[in-house]
């Protein structure tokens, strides 16, 4: 505890450099971060080297991104996000998680995804969340308890999914206020972001929205309904004016790959004030899913190249949940780095894999992590030595079939339960077709 307090004091001292003269003192800040992080396996040495390399190249796009954060985001918000994300969730939280992973011999996540509600004011084509219905909610006290339990395990990063989380925006802001040492990110369709909510975000300083965007107006409104794109632009304008950080969430499909990976799209994001873009591969989850929306192998290869191109050239941080598996050792679900708790309290291994043998209303968070299904993940990860084939459903469907059968996990889709066989059968052909591309890309990136 004493060591943690010293680190917090060190960060506070370091951040004063940024407040006084941010552009000139970034290197001093990183020197402080190096001292606080120390040495050893939990010191984020590789990540710190990357940041130093960015600071050594002020002409680079990533340096420009750092400047955007400093210039475009409220200084107190930057300070809070820096402290809660980099200090609490990473430098302090990670070593505690590693210790507990060894102590309990199970996965301890870095982040928890929560569905405050299954309610949503839109009905998007192919959306898996619609399978839950619209009447389920985790109470404020249940959400609060999950966060309290998470913090005991060293977890300070919480991500809201849904449904539309902002249906519960008053509770979400209250949780931000109560857990001021945590960082909260929320996926949202942006239709409920108004000036009052933006002011609340500015007040609590630890809430970051990730707005769902499908591409240009035609692509977006085609999946989310006429007028949705206009509401997204209105929300982005408001957030930028309030100097609040935000990003986008992009589900890439066979229909929109070109639209959401073009230079025009990336430049539009930067112009609107977007700081990060989180890409997700369309998953055929649910009985009403549309398998035809799954990208072809050539489209997925194109997304692999385009997201990396964006990271090399644009002042925007792009992440691909599926194609960046090579950077995180494959599948991160099952509590290895994150888990998902739906609005019914069911603890799923992944936001895309709706099977569970535990409910947070009946077990503690740690007990859920030690359940048969989560231990099956723990014992079988990685599911493929090629981390461009990370998922036990999409690229290795036999793995999910086996784990669900062995643990007798049940479908958590409330309205229309889907068997693991039905789900995985939609992925068999895809997995077979993707394998040659994955092997080619993996071999090219591991030539040495």
Residue positions per predicted region:
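Radical SAM enzyme [4Fe-4S]-AdoMet core and its adjacent flexible, acidic
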Residues: 1-49, 53, 221-334, 343-344, ...
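Flexible mid-to-C-terminal extensions adjoining Fe-S/redox cofactors in radical SAM and related proteins
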Residues: 2-24, 28-31, 39-43, 352-448
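Radical SAM/AdoMet-radical enzyme domain recognition
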Residues: 140-160, 166-280
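Short cysteine clusters
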Residues: 120, 124-127, 331, 345, ...
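Short, charged low-complexity linear segments at domain edges
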Residues: 88-109, 319, 325, 359-375
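A short, flexible beta-alpha/helix-coil linker loop
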Residues: 130-134, 216-219, 284-287
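Conserved alpha-helical substructure of the radical SAM core
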Residues: 32-196
């Amino acid at each position: 505890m004493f060591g943690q307090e010293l680190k917090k004091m060190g960060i506070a001292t370091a951040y004063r450099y940024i407040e006084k003269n941010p552009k000139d003192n970034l290197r001093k800040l990183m020197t402080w971060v190096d001292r606080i992080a120390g040495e050893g396996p939990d010191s984020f040495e590789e990540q710190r080297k990357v940041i130093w390399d960015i600071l050594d190249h002020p002409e680079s796009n990533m340096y420009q991104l750092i400047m955007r954060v400093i210039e475009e985001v409220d200084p107190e918000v930057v300070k809070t996000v820096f402290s809660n994300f980099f200090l609490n969730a990473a430098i302090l939280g990670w070593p505690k998680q590693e210790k507990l992973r060894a102590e309990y011999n199970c996965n301890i996540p870095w982040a928890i995804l929560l569905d405050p509600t299954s309610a949503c004011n839109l009905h998007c084509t192919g959306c898996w969340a619609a399978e839950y219905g619209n009447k389920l909610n985790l109470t404020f006290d249940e959400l609060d308890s999950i966060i309290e339990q998470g913090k005991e395990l060293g977890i300070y990063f919480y991500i809201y999914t849904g449904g539309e989380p902002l249906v519960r925006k008053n509770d979400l802001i209250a949780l931000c206020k109560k857990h001021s040492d945590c960082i909260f990110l929320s996926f949202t369709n942006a239709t409920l972001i108004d000036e009052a909510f933006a002011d609340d975000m500015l007040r609590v300083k630890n809430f970051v929205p990730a707005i769902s965007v499908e591409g240009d107006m035609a692509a977006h409104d085609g999946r989310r309904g006429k007028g949705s794109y206009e509401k997204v632009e209105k929300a982005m304008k408001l957030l930028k004016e309030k100097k609040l950080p935000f990003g986008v969430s992009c589900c890439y499909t066979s229909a929109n790959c070109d639209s959401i990976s073009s230079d025009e799209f990336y430049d539009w994001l930067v112009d609107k004030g977007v700081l990060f873009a989180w890409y997700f591969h369309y998953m055929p989850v649910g009985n009403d899913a549309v398998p035809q929306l799954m990208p072809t192998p050539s489209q997925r290869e194109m997304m692999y190249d385009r997201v990396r191109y964006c990271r090399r050239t644009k002042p925007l941080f792009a992440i691909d949940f599926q194609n960046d598996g090579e950077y995180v050792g494959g599948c991160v679900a099952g509590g290895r780095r994150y888990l998902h708790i739906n609005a019914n309290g069911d603890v799923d291994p992944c936001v895309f894999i709706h099977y569970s043998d535990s409910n947070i209303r009946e077990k503690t968070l740690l007990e859920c992590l030690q359940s048969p299904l989560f231990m099956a993940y723990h014992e079988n990860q990685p599911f493929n030595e090629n981390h461009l084939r990370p998922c036990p459903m999409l690229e290795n469907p036999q793995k999910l079939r086996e784990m669900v059968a062995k643990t007798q996990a049940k479908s958590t889709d409330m309205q229309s339960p889907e068997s693991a066989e039905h789900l995985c059968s939609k992925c068999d052909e895809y997995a077979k077709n993707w394998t040659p591309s994955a092997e080619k890309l993996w071999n090219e990136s591991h030539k040495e």
